Amino acid sequence: ASDVYKRQNGALLAKKISKELDLISDKNIIFCSMKINKSNPTENIQLSIDINECKNQSVVIVDDVLNSGKTLAYAVKHFLDIEIESIKTAVLVNRSHKKFPISADFKGINLSSSLQNHVDVVFMKDKIEAFLF
């Protein structure tokens, strides 16, 4: 896989959230990973399931860090091609540098930082840590 597809922290976070929801909800939770080329987000977006499985369903799009909003905006746009019940967005770290008109419905933490800062999210067996540098 090319460098633009390697990081899958959003999928790891979504998997953890879907497992937790399975424990507390009687709803049928379907996990789906999505691959978006960050340098060319209009290029072939890949889903791990057929998009039609999401038809007339509620969709939650999960990412680890919301920076400019570009990735999340293109992820939401992808699901607008089918009829769905609702779309919500969830992020672990919400930064305030958005260039796109998108926001997270569910946020782990709001982080004010400069554009020069970088947030790295590390997934371990028992915990998830976010580092600002």
Predicted features, each with a name:
Residues 15, 19-58, 70:
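Short, glycine/charge-rich flexible loops or terminal/linker lids adjacent to PRPP-binding catalytic cores
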